[in-house]
């Protein structure tokens, strides 16, 4: 069983129940899924750019991403509806916990001059969004094989009803929020 999941069940659930006075164990907020999205704007002119992004996302998450397509045509971006413009992965269960564990303990500390992540990126419904500027912070990515620095969005979806509960859940899991 995953380290983070074990910690959640043994330590986090009791402490959250105590803090927010939940009536049952099922009311305690938990992680639902983590969505990792990589928008590849270059894919419009160069279809090969997307293949590389898909490959990198697969290495980072251990799961094959789906290719996202443009919903609308935008002439300013030379974009037609249905063109592939990105890739995303939805992680649940074991893989989700593994990814979060790796993100907290390995990847985030590797960010240049890292001082913690913003406390303000909650959406009001207990979900947290985090932007990663470069894919190099993940240990699976080999620096020499990278053709271009790409960023990505990581959305952590929890069952918490308020931001405060979600913040408490994530910080007990070890998310390095700014003091």
UniProtKB/Swiss-Prot annotation:
<comment type="similarity">
    <text>Belongs to the universal ribosomal protein uL5 family.</text>
</comment>
<dbReference type="GO" id="GO:0005840">
    <property type="term" value="C:ribosome"/>
</dbReference>
<dbReference type="GO" id="GO:0019843">
    <property type="term" value="F:rRNA binding"/>
</dbReference>
<dbReference type="InterPro" id="IPR020929">
    <property type="entry name" value="Ribosomal_uL5_CS"/>
</dbReference>
<keyword id="KW-0694">RNA-binding</keyword>
<dbReference type="GO" id="GO:0000049">
    <property type="term" value="F:tRNA binding"/>
</dbReference>
<comment type="subunit">
    <text>Part of the 50S ribosomal subunit; part of the 5S rRNA/L5/L18/L25 subcomplex. Contacts the 5S rRNA and the P site tRNA. Forms a bridge to the 30S subunit in the 70S ribosome.</text>
</comment>
<dbReference type="InterPro" id="IPR022803">
    <property type="entry name" value="Ribosomal_uL5_dom_sf"/>
</dbReference>
<keyword id="KW-0689">Ribosomal protein</keyword>
<dbReference type="InterPro" id="IPR031310">
    <property type="entry name" value="Ribosomal_uL5_N"/>
</dbReference>
<keyword id="KW-0687">Ribonucleoprotein</keyword>
<keyword id="KW-0820">tRNA-binding</keyword>
<dbReference type="Pfam" id="PF00673">
    <property type="entry name" value="Ribosomal_L5_C"/>
</dbReference>
<dbReference type="GO" id="GO:0003735">
    <property type="term" value="F:structural constituent of ribosome"/>
</dbReference>
<dbReference type="InterPro" id="IPR002132">
    <property type="entry name" value="Ribosomal_uL5"/>
</dbReference>
<dbReference type="GO" id="GO:0006412">
    <property type="term" value="P:translation"/>
</dbReference>
<dbReference type="GO" id="GO:1990904">
    <property type="term" value="C:ribonucleoprotein complex"/>
</dbReference>
<keyword id="KW-0699">rRNA-binding</keyword>
<protein>
    <recommendedName>
        <fullName>Large ribosomal subunit protein uL5</fullName>
    </recommendedName>
</protein>
<dbReference type="InterPro" id="IPR031309">
    <property type="entry name" value="Ribosomal_uL5_C"/>
</dbReference>
<dbReference type="InterPro" id="IPR020930">
    <property type="entry name" value="Ribosomal_uL5_bac-type"/>
</dbReference>
<comment type="function">
    <text>This is one of the proteins that bind and probably mediate the attachment of the 5S RNA into the large ribosomal subunit, where it forms part of the central protuberance. In the 70S ribosome it contacts protein S13 of the 30S subunit (bridge B1b), connecting the 2 subunits; this bridge is implicated in subunit movement. Contacts the P site tRNA; the 5S rRNA and some of its associated proteins might help stabilize positioning of ribosome-bound tRNAs.</text>
</comment>
<dbReference type="Pfam" id="PF00281">
    <property type="entry name" value="Ribosomal_L5"/>
</dbReference>
């Amino acid at each position: 069983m995953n380290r983070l999941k074990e910690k959640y069940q043994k330590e986090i659930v009791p402490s959250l129940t105590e803090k927010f006075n939940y009536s049952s164990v099922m009311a305690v907020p938990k992680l639902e899924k983590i969505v990792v999205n990589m928008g590849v704007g270059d894919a419009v002119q160069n279809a090969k750019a997307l293949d590389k992004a898909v490959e990198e996302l697969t290495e980072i998450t251990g799961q094959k991403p789906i290719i996202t397509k443009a919903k609308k045509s935008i002439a300013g971006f030379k974009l037609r509806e249905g063109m592939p413009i990105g890739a995303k992965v939805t992680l649940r269960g074991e893989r989700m916990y593994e990814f979060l564990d790796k993100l907290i303990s390995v990847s985030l500390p590797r960010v240049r001059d890292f001082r913690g992540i913003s406390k303000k990126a909650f959406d009001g419904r207990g979900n947290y969004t985090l932007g990663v500027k470069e894919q190099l912070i993940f240990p699976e990515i080999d620096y020499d094989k990278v053709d271009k620095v790409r960023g990505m969005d990581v959305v952590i979806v929890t069952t918490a009803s308020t931001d405060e509960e979600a913040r408490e859940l994530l910080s007990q899991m070890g998310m390095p929020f700014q003091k």
